[in-house]
Amino acid sequence: MFLAQEIIRKKRDGHALSDEEIRFFINGIRDNTISEGQIAALAMTIFFHDMTMPERVSLTMAMRDSGTVLDWKSLNLNGPIVDKHSTGGVGDVTSLMLGPMVAACGGYVPMISGRGLGHTGGTLDKLEAIPGFDIFPDDNRFREIIQDVGVAIIGQTSSLAPADKRFYATRDITATVDSIPLITGSILAKKLAEGLDALVMDVKVGSGAFMPTYELSKALAEAIVGVANGAGVRTTALLTDMNQVLASSAGNAVEVREAVQFLTGEYRNPRLFDVTMALCVEMLISGQLAKDDAEARAKLQAVLDNGKAAEVFGRMVAAQKGPSDFVENYDKYLPTAMLSKAVYADTEGFISAMDTRALGMAVVSMGGGRRQASDTIDYSVGFTDMARLGDSIDGQRPLAVIHAKDEASWQEAAKAVKAAIILDDKAPASTPSVYRRITE
């Protein structure tokens, strides 16, 4: 039997906690036998003293085990259970293509996603732009969809990693969110509860990233890869660029539209293509569906070219109570904004920098995201035809097309877009979409 205050004291004094001590504390968070003050105190001691790798693995596993851990063995699936997690960005719609692409190549993707957080868009919010789409199927239905379709994208239920929910809520109000061991535990507890064979992490870098510097993004990626592999799940991470909006659009319905166009081949933004393919390649290799990069890319390109990936997306939408002809008739179903018109720069030049975070917040301000949990989302608003770094901007090439609910909202968004995009008289050096791959 342990005492919570003695565990806090031990960590406060700079000592490593045992697996048993960590499990006792996490189970107490779940069972409400540990107070909010005690959670806050432990979070702050971890913030200042960090955690060893064994402590990090124990924390993650204890949070994972605080609720249900999905088990797929009884379904006798003929492929690996794989997923990816992104630290979030703007125009980051990769999940909507990646899940169907990997499923079309023989993987099973039980993706448990989140809502928008701060300036970042949420996969669940995007999917809810599709009429009828059900993000909370019951457990049996979720398993059926995975078995029949190969991919489902759902919201986190209360049975998955419940200790994390309470731990995170306390961290959020005690300035202890940005601790690498605590971020790692929070992300992986939910992902590992999916019962995965393999995981790829997409850790964003740049002005729209969660972590403020490249070094911190790299440290987070290394921590997640180390802990997940320590927990027995084959995991790699990619550091990808978020110094500009990833897709050509940012919003909810507008990003779903771009995802369908990507899958059908109607339009593929080159940077979005690079990042999506790179993440899918990691999933196929880690899931042992391909032996190397070349084989993985060939398989993925084939399911895009032969329409199989688009077909899987359509089947997922239908299985989750969306329209059965969504891929063929997406424009009929997706909401459109009252006002859509282009915004132009006041001067000419090349785009040298972009405050991606500010662009994400502009979408939120238009109603495309939540400032508080009770807010309702306007799925129709957002940006399309986003200009990219290095683009030559003049009276012919707009910075973006803004989709707004009225003129006043459009004007406010136009001001934000102009302020967020910096022009220079010469083009900047091009930056890669994927900076590096982390395997340990």
From Swiss-Prot:
Pfam families cross-referenced by the UniProt entry: Glycos_trans_3N, Glycos_transf_3, PYNP_C
Pathway per the UniProt entry: Pyrimidine metabolism; dTMP biosynthesis via salvage pathway; dTMP from thymine: step 1/2
Gene Ontology biological process terms, A to Z: pyrimidine nucleobase metabolic process; thymidine metabolic process
SMART domains from the UniProt entry: PYNP_C
EC nos: 2.4.2.4
GO molecular function, one term: thymidine phosphorylase activity
Catalytic activity: thymidine + phosphate = 2-deoxy-alpha-D-ribose 1-phosphate + thymine
The protein's enzyme class: transferase
Cellular component annotations (GO), alphabetically ordered: cytosol
Alphabetical UniProt keywords: Glycosyltransferase, Transferase
Quaternary state and interactors: Homodimer.
Similarity comment: family membership: Belongs to the thymidine/pyrimidine-nucleoside phosphorylase family.
Alphabetical list of NCBIfam families matching this protein: PRK05820.1 (NF004490), T_phosphoryl (TIGR02643), Y_phosphoryl (TIGR02644)
The protein's name: Thymidine phosphorylase
Organism of this sequence: Salmonella heidelberg (strain SL476)
Lineage: Bacteria, Pseudomonadati, Pseudomonadota, Gammaproteobacteria, Enterobacterales
